[in-house]
């Protein structure tokens, strides 16, 4: 029985990402490349991930780090949006990739940029949503139960003491 593709595209692996894994030239869109790279992470295909980086990224020099990221327990991919770039040889894919580590589930959110060169799509770089600073658990309480000491950091996030800021 054929297994479903790790990229979540509702096709079998053989009908989906295996085609790209066997021949990079068969990748027709940035989204297809992004999905095949995610599947390569799930399946441990370090060589595929390295060769689908744009040559300017010198991915071979970062092979060890790439192999470590592939070694994560990847569990789900959500494509948020795929869009064209400023020209036909550029595209963007925004996605969330979920993985488990030390009994916790994490999400990698990225807007990846892909470029097409000599007929091949490559991953070149990505941007990440601004990392939210870890919120103080007291901020999840209702206002009536929030107790802030005068010498505690201000809840507005200014970095000042509460008594010198909002207190």
From Swiss-Prot:
Source domain of life: Bacteria
InterPro entries linked: NTF2-like_dom_sf, SEC_C_motif, UPF0225, YchJ-like_M
Pfam families assigned: SEC-C (PF02810), YchJ_M-like (PF17775)
HAMAP family: UPF0225
UniProt similarity note: Belongs to the UPF0225 family.
Protein name, as recorded: UPF0225 protein VP1145
Record organism: Vibrio parahaemolyticus serotype O3:K6 (strain RIMD 2210633)
Lineage: Bacteria, Pseudomonadati, Pseudomonadota, Gammaproteobacteria, Vibrionales
